[in-house]
């Protein structure tokens, strides 16, 4: 029993990694704007996260390689695929970093009446020192405990909502896509299925058995999904227009004055830990694909530091620009939601590499689940891109049958190619 509990705590790193300012913002905004009707997006993304993270960890357990090394072996004669996968993850990290620093600034701003640029310089300065010295991990874990306490406060607050059990059940199992807010749906998916977590999960899979990995991972991610849903439910109590101040007031009403400060500290902690994690993940991703055995790609190497430093600079710039936090954070999650099909496609192709996975290649069910995940995220992403193009040329798109069929066809074409690649292996 003790071993199983420790295993769950071990894999809780993944759920802690996706409960950052992005989850707090997108889930709260979804609840405030659409009630419980978008719960299905969190249920889908939680289940999809389990499928993809299990696959990522299975690669390491079966082959003894990291995802980056497995990608290099699988696409050795297709360098463009390696660049595409690494580029998607690293670009996604840069987008996340913008939201992370803005989220940390917002949390600090709820506590201290100082100009945002002061917090920006302090946060990026401390993060640089920690990343340079290699002591970021222990600090991130300590602050992660504060995020967990804030999550517990959201769970408690969710019991005070006015929605009926029937409405909540419908929101969970009957998908609804608001035509004017597709970006929010993509954001909910992108904030839960974090592409760089696939690399993190792959590394955590070392020295574990498949059975214990699956149990720990499913329970840990499931708990993370429940907390995300609790944030959305709590968001239904927040007034519009949505703001962090309004959300702090919601928690204050539910748990008393400490709730306000708990939200502020938790938002800062979530943003700060993610400010460290995103640059680190981008450097690890680049290292695993391009830098095996090279001194410049070691943790103290020039290339390694250039990658995480570049991501940190992106966050610094966005923090100094003084942009409104909620749109920046939402856009960061949506960008990763659009990039997700690229990472998921690469993962599926590696999982179907017979020479690499031997007896642990994907079965029919795992492949169908993976194709479904890629299909849904492709559909959402293409719909958002199409809508943006239509708005740019002055055409108001609607969710009519012709439009729906066209977007579905565009999503099915790459899905059909992927299916042929997988099932002809």
Walk through the language-model features, giving the residues of each.
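Juxtamembrane transmembrane-helix boundary signature
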Residues: 14, 41-75, 85-92, 417-424
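Flexible loop linkers connecting adjacent transmembrane helices
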Residues: 27-29, 54-79, 106, 137, ...
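Selective recognition of specific alpha-helical transmembrane segments in multi-pass small-molecule
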Residues: 44-52, 56, 212-237
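Helix-loop-helix module between adjacent transmembrane segments
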Residues: 49-57, 80-100, 105-135, 190-191, ...
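Loop-to-transmembrane helix boundary motifs in multi-pass membrane proteins
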Residues: 79-80, 117-121, 219, 223, ...
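Transmembrane alpha-helical segments of multi-pass small-molecule transport proteins
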Residues: 84-86, 110-132, 149-154, 298-315, ...
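C-terminal membrane-solvent junction of multi-pass transporters and transport-like membrane proteins
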Residues: 145, 298-306, 335-337, 342-407
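Hydrophobic alpha-helical segments and their helix-loop junctions in multi-pass secondary transporters
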Residues: 147-173, 182-203, 346-355, 380-388, ...
